[in-house]
Amino acid sequence: MFELELHPKWKKRLEEAKLTSVEALLQLDLQEKLEFLPGIGGGYYQVADDLRVFLYCDLQISWHRILRSFVMFQWPCSLSEREQRGIEMLHQAGFQIAEVMAWGNRKVLRLPRQGVLLLRALAGLPLPRFLRQELDEKVRRRTILAAEETLQALQEGGFFWPDCLPENFFVQADGSIALIHVHSVRRQRLNALQAQQQFEFFYSRL
């Protein structure tokens, strides 16, 4: 198994919770489990009353995925590593995003074979779930507008996010929008048509 690196800010809390190894993370009884691709998933876990986390697990990195990355002229990496890079990039750009608590990647000959990423879970709801629960039409419209403005800010900041699904816009307690599942985000300036297509993609799934 591979080593888990702890962010200094969260080292003490993770030690108290005995979550200092990859083995410990993989034994968590995760809630609200998600599967992004075969072998790639994650879920939530309540560490303490004031701390909920989200764990990404990428434990079956196939040779097909590695070869596909090379064909696309990209160096292969695990989904958890891409998520961590996306978080760091968007955090530096001023977007609201989850905090990285711990990470680990096992590589063979510099090629990724497994990866994990532990995040502090955001407090709030994915946009579609929020809209289903919110009865005030003004609040609903204001929240959708906030998500639209966030997507526009991404575009104006030079980011392309293929996974700009409504469920990846997270409505926080104060009504602000945070972003989740950002492993596909990359630096790319969009022309007017591409920007419009992104909004159409977002609206079609709202």
Label each region the model flagged.
Residues 1-34:
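Juxta-kinase regulatory segment immediately upstream of eukaryotic protein kinase catalytic domains
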Residues 22-125, 156:
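Conserved ATP-binding subdomain of kinase catalytic cores across diverse folds
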Residues 43-47, 55, 149-187:
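Active-site acidic catalytic loop and adjacent metal/ATP-binding pocket
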Residues 63, 106, 127, 170-175, ...:
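Active-site-proximal flexible loops/turns
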Residues 65-71, 129-133, 192:
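Short acidic, glycine/proline-rich loop/turn micro-motifs
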Residues 75-78, 135, 139, 190, ...:
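Short alpha-helix boundary/capping segments
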Residues 80-81, 86-97, 128-162, 166-167:
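Conserved kinase catalytic-core helix
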Residues 142, 172-206:
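C-lobe/activation-segment region of protein kinase-like
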